[in-house]
Amino acid sequence: MVQKTRRRVLVAGALAAAGLTVAKIAEAIPTGKLTIALVLKSLADPFTVAMASAAQNYQKHFASQFDLNVLGTSTELDTATQIRMVDDLIGAHTSAIVLAPTDSKALVPVVARAINAGVIVIAIDNPLDEAALDALHLSVPFVGPDNRKGAETIGDYVATKLARGDEVGIIEGVTTDRNAQQRTEGFKAAMDAAGMKVVAVAPGDYTYAKGKAAAATMLAQHPRLRALLCANDNMATGAVDAVRLAHRTGSVYITGYNNNPDIRPLLNSGKILATVDQFAARQAVFGIDVALKALTEMTRQEDLTPLVETPLQLVKSGDR
């Protein structure tokens, strides 16, 4: 099922990149039926695929109530394409947009255009920048976990494996994303509380390659490094390979974030110490549910509950 879903969303993403997506999809939407669009980040990320799959399964149970368009970008940083997607969805008279922003600030202007056009907008996974929203007198609900709390939880666990004064590095996500910023804040808070030394912080943009490169640089510059706290599992996987190439396997703890299925072997082997499950499927479904409820109850954007917090769970090496 996941593979079928991935093929469908990849096709949608490719059409969007060509500027063809919503105009074509809109032709197939029955007149008067509610339409909800799920606009995601990189379709190459298993976390995004899990969101897409869950959303489409959810829609099947409520097909008489609404149609669902699932769109996504080719990379984590493809903000221009995501902005174009939202503009196209406005033009297609979409009822609601559930958005996982590629950039917490850069998406705010197009979100404002959507709201001003009468489209309900909900943010999931990555909250929009509060100051940018406030400047435009907008409110966009965030459906998702407390990223700082999740990062603190995993940081606290790592600290139990370390000695006070040990050196650690942090590999961040996309630095313009609020969720990445919150995870870095949480990692730092946990390390400070435990008396560890954060000797390096570098972005890995949520990708394997950049996570590996950031880890390699930290390992070369800080030979006494004892842990690498990574803001997602893709970067943690890259860090595992960087540690192996540096002949440091077993002496550097590595953590991830998301609990993607791909890292289960690394957790089982102990190469990744722990990750955080933020339940991608639930985030997508809860976001759509909030949008659908707003539409059916005709709730105004400004009257929507600003935060719907979703669960987190620490997943440790050896857990079954």
Question: PLM features: what roles do these ranges have?
Answer:
Residues 104-149, 160, 167, 258-273, ...:
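Flexible loop/hinge segments that line or gate small-molecule binding clefts
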Residues 31-33, 171, 175, 179, ...:
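Hinge/cleft segment of the Venus flytrap/periplasmic-binding protein
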Residues 99-116, 187, 199-200, 204-265:
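Hydrophobic alpha-helical
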Residues 1-16:
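N-terminal secretory signal peptides and thylakoid transit peptides that target proteins
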Residues 1, 22-36:
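C-terminal segment of N-terminal export signals and the immediately downstream linker at the start
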